[in-house]
């Protein structure tokens, strides 16, 4: 008797769409929570180190300053490896930047992408800072990444809003 009553109640609720609406609402809340918590994180430099790098001082003679930053909205859950001349400097995440002092001259900047690394070759001059933007893009299986050199003005503006990651 109780089983018949329970089955009838379930039938009425399902036919009115009550369970479907509740299930959809709960699934939506869980989905949004997962998306918000899926943002990638990496080891961060101290506030003092970050603020010092944001002063954009000219590097010593014979050296160049290299800022690599990521400010794109796409791919917030992705971390991408970064390399300078095939040497690993760290994993990027959204809203972070790296600063490295490098010898003036030709360099290959690389980022992990979907199937292989994406490279950007630059030639730097002594005493100058250079700004490279890493951006993520949609891929076939996972998001890819690429690099572009930007103007000093654009780079400084973007980096002023970001925090510095620890580099290796």
Curated annotation (Swiss-Prot):
Q: Which UniProt keywords apply?
A: Membrane, Transmembrane, Transmembrane helix
Q: Which residues cross the membrane?
A: 23-47
What membrane topology does this protein have? Single-pass membrane protein
Broad class of the protein's primary localization: membrane
Entry keyword annotation includes Transmembrane helix: yes
GO CC, any one term: membrane
Which Pfam family, any one of them, does this sequence belong to? DUF2846
Q: Which InterPro entries match?
A: DUF2846, UCP012335
Which cell locations does it reside in?
Membrane
The entry's protein name is Uncharacterized protein HI_1456
Species, as recorded: Haemophilus influenzae (strain ATCC 51907 / DSM 11121 / KW20 / Rd)
